[in-house]
Amino acid sequence: IDTRDWSSDVCSSDLKIKDYRIYHGFYCGVCQDLKEDHGQTSRVTLTYDVTFLGILLTGLYETETKREEYFCAMHPFKKHLCLRNQWTAYAADMNVLLSYYNLLDDWEDEKKPVPLILASALKKDVKRLKEKYPRQARAIETYLQKLKACEQEASTDLDRAAADTGEMLGEIYVWEEDVWADTMRKIGCAMGRFIYRMDAYEDIEKDRKKGNYNPWKPIAQEKDFDDRARQILMMEAAEASRQFEKLPIIEYVDILRNILYSGIWTKYDRIKSREKETRRK
């Protein structure tokens, strides 16, 4: 699962300017936590998906959030809003864990130096994070073992790798085994399945040409493949939204709904737009 290109961005055209600023304030908050807790290099691994998780946990636990303003390399001439709390710090920690294992996987697959260099820069922090979050770290390691087995066996089970991804992300979404743990785990599971399926859907042509593992391959040549794939993706997205609506979240709910109902489809829209452009040529 490529943690650098996940799907939980906002749909900016459907979001109020105030909420869009808050969303990017949380994104910058996670980025600042990465810098302070894990060093400058870790910032290149930041994803929108951990930002979603940070906002989700903030809304659920109604945590006090510190408002700051910073200059940075991305905003060198004007200070920008930065929102931080314990959940942006947790999101940053999870980002480092996920990115580290993903980079190692990239290195094993392609033997390119950049992933190994980045992973080496994160290694010391990962050791500390594994001690701090043993359940989450174990879930990621177990997931990668299961995914490797799927690839080696060239499994034709459409649901196997997606379910493994969901199981892993479900553990990341759960902070502790409290009254909300079951619902949070289910949201994470549905999001994980959606993300894995969407990534695989995007890569189907590339994987077919290169002979890489892709669970969509057995049905990709069928006449109704695109419709069937969209229906499956819609089912996963609907389950994530259904579980989310069980949570008593008031603050930031418009941002979170924007992501769940619209934002997670931005990658799908890009895929379809590229396909349309290709057909025109």
What label would you give each PLM region?
Residues 14-64:
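N-terminal ordered "arm"
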Residues 34, 77-94, 119, 123-164, ...:
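Divalent-cation-assisted or electrostatically stabilized phosphate/pyrophosphate-binding catalytic cores
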Residues 154-198:
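A mid-sequence, solvent-exposed acidic-amphipathic segment
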Residues 111-117, 248-260:
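Acidic/histidine metal-binding catalytic segments
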Residues 45-66, 72-115, 183-206:
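Active-site alpha-helical segments that house and flank conserved acidic catalytic motifs
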Residues 1-10:
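Single conserved hydrophobic/aromatic residue that forms the stacking wall/gate
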Residues 262-281:
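Acidic, carboxylate-rich catalytic segments that either coordinate divalent cations
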